């Protein structure tokens, strides 16, 4: 992609695209691999640092290309070790990237859009409205920046980032081409060399793009379900009105059937007090997913201002999990991480220059709802 400087940003190019770039400037294709290693293995953003690239070629690259990642605005570290970066992208909006360390892995949660157009009712990102898709460089740039922050050089040795989940701000499948390119770089040996089993794309259910996915890439798939029936899901996840559950699950199963091995669909389900956490919801979920090879990840709601929802009690969470277990499912409840720095699931907001004006409308409605009503003034 050409940036505002008129130069090609090499950060977001796949290996095939990098080879095409070197063809276009009259250079041999093996240079693509050399430059990719410098960018992604070593975090280099200066052609002068590429010591196995000749001076003449370095000067040529300097004239027509650049390596530009998103700008880090802030970095916060939680008491539990979770890190959150706020990064500014070309549109002027800010998005958030979260790193979650555990004993056996380090998971990076990556954003795909500045804001989100889907307006899921329990997600703070959706309340920010939508500005733009991130470029491939801005998506993979979050991995690049995080890797540089850890000082892991090269990226594939003693790596801090073992897993990447496309679960940050935005709906990845509504930024299809750029997300596909970024995930290819994540898995490319000359990029970050992350196993396809350790790269997960999460979707709220853009059925045509799920159907298209297998033609382009092989990664793990997670479905943001959040409701066991169409009536409730229409309210929580409005895209369900266009792509209802039967159609959605058939699409997911079609994609999963193309993958090798014993890989299963991950079901994400945010538990909302008295909304979708009752025994009847668990029973409906068991029936809905009976023939779907899957694992279920329960996510207790992480509150944000004026959300209108509450987190269920620990007893209600355990009850729901136990009911699903007894129904024969592999179920885990996600431990809340990074909530003290607003980095928990559903809390990512960034700073979005909202083209939909949804955030203005949302704030106005919530303020009206919070105002005390004068009963004497009512008819």
Curated annotation (Swiss-Prot):
Active site positions: 96, 345
Recorded superkingdom: Bacteria
EC number: 2.1.1.192
Predominant localisation class: cytoplasm
Enzyme kind, highest EC tier: transferase
Disulfide bond positions: 109-345
Domain Radical SAM core as annotated: residue spans: 102-342
Biological processes per GO annotation: rRNA base methylation; tRNA methylation
Record flagged with keyword Ligase: no
GO cellular component terms, semicolon-separated: cytoplasm
Cofactor binding annotation: Binds 1 [4Fe-4S] cluster. The cluster is coordinated with 3 cysteines and an exchangeable S-adenosyl-L-methionine.
Protein known as: Dual-specificity RNA methyltransferase RlmN
Gene: rlmN
């Amino acid at each position: 992609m050409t940036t505002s400087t008129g130069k090609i940003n090499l950060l977001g190019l796949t290996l095939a695209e990098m080879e095409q770039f070197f063809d276009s400037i009259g250079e041999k294709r093996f240079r693509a691999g050399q430059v990719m290693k410098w960018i992604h293995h070593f975090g280099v953003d200066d052609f002068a640092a590429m010591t196995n690239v000749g001076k003449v070629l370095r000067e040529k690259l300097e004239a027509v290309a650049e390596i530009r990642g998103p700008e880090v605005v802030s970095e916060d570290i939680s008491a539990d070790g979770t890190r959150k970066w706020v990064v500014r992208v070309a549109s002027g909006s800010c998005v958030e990237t979260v790193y979650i360390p555990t004993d056996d892995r380090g998971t990076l949660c990556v954003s795909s859009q500045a804001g989100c157009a889907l307006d899921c009712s329990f997600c703070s990102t959706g309340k920010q409205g939508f500005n733009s898709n991130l470029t491939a460089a801005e998506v993979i740039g979050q991995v690049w920046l995080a890797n540089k922050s850890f000082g892991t050089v090269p990226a594939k040795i003693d790596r801090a980032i073992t897993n990447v989940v496309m679960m940050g701000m935005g709906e990845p499948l509504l930024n299809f081409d750029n997300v596909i390119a970024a995930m290819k770089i994540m898995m490319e040996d000359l990029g970050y060399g992350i196993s396809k089993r350790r790269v997960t794309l999460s979707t709220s259910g853009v059925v045509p793009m799920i159907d298209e996915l297998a033609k382009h890439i092989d990664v793990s798939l997670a479905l943001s379900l959040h409701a066991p029936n169409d009536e409730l899901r229409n309210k929580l996840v409005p895209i369900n009105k266009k792509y209802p559950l039967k159609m959605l699950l058939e699409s997911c199963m079609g994609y999963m059937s193309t993958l090798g091995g014993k890989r299963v669909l991950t079901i994400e389900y945010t538990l909302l007090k008295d909304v979708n956490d009752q025994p009847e919801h668990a029973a409906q979920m068991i029936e809905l997913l009976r023939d779907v090879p899957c694992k279920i990840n329960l996510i207790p709601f992480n509150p944000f201002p004026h959300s209108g929802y509450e987190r269920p009690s620990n007893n209600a969470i355990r009850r729901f999990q136990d009911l699903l277990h007894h129904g024969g499912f592999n179920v885990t409840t996600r431990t809340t991480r990074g909530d003290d720095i607003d980095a928990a699931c559903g809390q990512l907001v960034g700073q979005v220059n909202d083209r939909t004006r949804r955030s203005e409308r949302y704030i106005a409605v919530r303020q009206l709802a919070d105002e005390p009503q004068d009963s004497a003034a009512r008819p």
